[in-house]
Amino acid sequence: MKAQYFFWILFLIGFYWMLYLYQDFLMDALIAGLLCVGLFQVKVFLNKRFSNVISSFLCVLVLASVVIVPLYFIVYKGSNVIFEINFEKLSALIKWLKGTITENLSHFPAIHDGVSKFLENFSAASITGYLLKVSSYIGKYSLKLVTDALFILGLLFFFFYYGEKFYRYFLGVLPLEMNQSKKIFEEVAGILRIVLLTSLITVILEGVAFGTMIIWFGHDGWSLGILYGLASLVPAVGGALIWIPIAIYELYHGHVNEAIFIVLYSILLIGVLIDSVIKPILIVFIKKRIFKTTLKINEILIFFSMIAGISQFGFWGIIVGPTITAFFIALLRLYENYFIQKEQKTCEC
């Protein structure tokens, strides 16, 4: 057996066992690596003023405040809402909702019976039990999320500290020319920077838009604005987690016009205008004006890759989806610019 074949057999065996050993941490390591790549320009900026250790720590500290503090805020506010529920008021609200729905559906016999049977099991006791189950699930999920976040932050410090060494090492190890490897890396890093900044600005815009509106109806605009901005990152439901309960609350108190306005404002202005219209425009602006990058990836493709990533990977899909897309497109360009052209030159000769 040739030494080269023997080496690759040993390498594949070792690689398999490495994956098996660290399989529970692969996603955390991937997220930490992608965040490091996307934010490494911040690290380079801080390196001009601080030592490598301090600049790495500052980068991790900023990310920790962005990830852990909002999570604590959500858990704290959510637990307060659940444990401060007034059972009598909740029963009255449910009774009113059931009566209103049944009365309005009396003109539609085809669906009236089915909805009435469903509402028979709809009571304050069942909702309270469901909320307790949800709070228990949120508690377990939050604990796992905090554990993952702490592990990611630990890996981030490691990646930030040794980032330049890792970069040079991987460029040298890859079986490609140096400029080819750099182009792939620059493509992925550029997309990550655009996605991270776009997501941050979108969260702020949606939170400010909702908080500014809701304060006029006597609610806590600061807290609900933060919650809405964070809820907008939740796949599928997004800000509906916030505006639906508030609209129901306004309906219960007889504020029909206010409830309709909250629903339309949340769906049309925030859901359609900001999330579906302004967000793609933001991607174009950030790409061409802020980073002034020469990336040849369509902005709409970046937008849809974020949506696809969220649907497949959940919260972290915001960065995983665009990364996969950018990496694949970079490989296609590499194949087009180097391998196809090389074959054409060979044929001409």
From Swiss-Prot:
GO terms for cellular component: plasma membrane. This is Putative transport protein jhp_0514. PANTHER family: TRANSMEMBRANE PROTEIN (PTHR21716), TRANSMEMBRANE PROTEIN 245 (PTHR21716:SF4). It is found in: Cell membrane. Keywords: Cell membrane, Membrane, Transmembrane, Transmembrane helix, Transport. Belongs to the autoinducer-2 exporter (AI-2E) (TC 2.A.86) family. The keyword Cell membrane applies. It is a multi-pass membrane protein. Pfam families: AI-2E_transport (PF01594). The chain crosses the membrane at residues 6-26, 27-47, 56-76, 143-163, 195-215, 224-244, 258-278, 300-320. InterPro entries: AI-2E-like.
